[in-house]
Amino acid sequence: MAATPESKVKKRIKEILTKFGAYYAMPIGTSFGNSGVPDFLCCVKGRFLAIEAKAGKGKTTALQDKHLCSIHTAGGMAVIVNEDTLDSLEKLLASI
């Protein structure tokens, strides 16, 4: 099976998180789960970081936006990453 554009972004995010020694989990969405939860839930040097992966010009859903906003409100960091912003993720992790 060929890798989807989003799966390629997720693969690169995993590589970056590993490079920085981050803990991460990737919740699996199911009909019984909590829809809209970000693709990656991470702990980087004691800081909570959620990452929503998108490919190309993919947009977040209203439910994903709600989760990202709730994470910010609770004091965590939440970012959306695509192919063009992988370098920004590395810079963010380096700054923590």
Regions found by a protein language model. Give the residues of each.
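Catalytic phosphate/metal-binding cores of nucleic-acid and nucleotide-processing enzymes, i.e., regions
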Residues: 1-96
